């Protein structure tokens, strides 16, 4: 069964909690589909080429149809000509959206949490607030746990905690309402407030 590492006020291991057993039983394909959809939604869609109807010029037939001994041509703007159109090229009208059902999103998050718990890098503590708002205090949390990088999940994200973690390249802090399977997967460790973890497991 997947275990969540419980931390005390000094961020030392104080025990373990069990994640619902069904989390580890979720088909990992749900996680794959969600991450694929999430990354697709980030695409900027800037690649754009001009087709036959978009390029200027080429209205006049360059030479007569027969009698020259060369290949026939009706326009200087076909895709085989230099300066001509592009055949089947990308346009900025393409929509990269990939639909993922609400249930699949939920299952993906459950699987992502189960994977982190199985590796022993899913932590929970009563409070993760940085009341000083200082980056050095936030950095001390990560150093104490000895992890490369971490996703910090707060039940109610306050401004001082956000400011404290914002300058750390190896950390990202989110409110529990914004956490998703991609964020959980991309970080080496996940540290959640106990109330945030309870709200997620209660929904499932």
Curated annotation (Swiss-Prot):
Domain of life: Bacteria
One CC-aspect GO term: ribosome
Keywords assigned: Ribonucleoprotein, Ribosomal protein, RNA-binding, rRNA-binding
InterPro entries: Ribosomal_uL4, Ribosomal_uL4-like, Ribosomal_uL4_dom_sf
Biological processes per GO annotation: translation
Keyword presence, Glycosyltransferase: no
The keyword RNA-binding appears for this protein: yes
A Pfam family this chain is assigned to: Ribosomal_L4
SUPFAM superfamilies attached to this UniProt entry: Ribosomal protein L4 (SSF52166)
Stated family: Belongs to the universal ribosomal protein uL4 family.
Subunit structure, interactors included: Part of the 50S ribosomal subunit.
HAMAP family: Ribosomal_uL4_B
Protein name (database record): Large ribosomal subunit protein uL4
Lineage of origin: Bacteria, Pseudomonadati, Campylobacterota, Epsilonproteobacteria, Campylobacterales
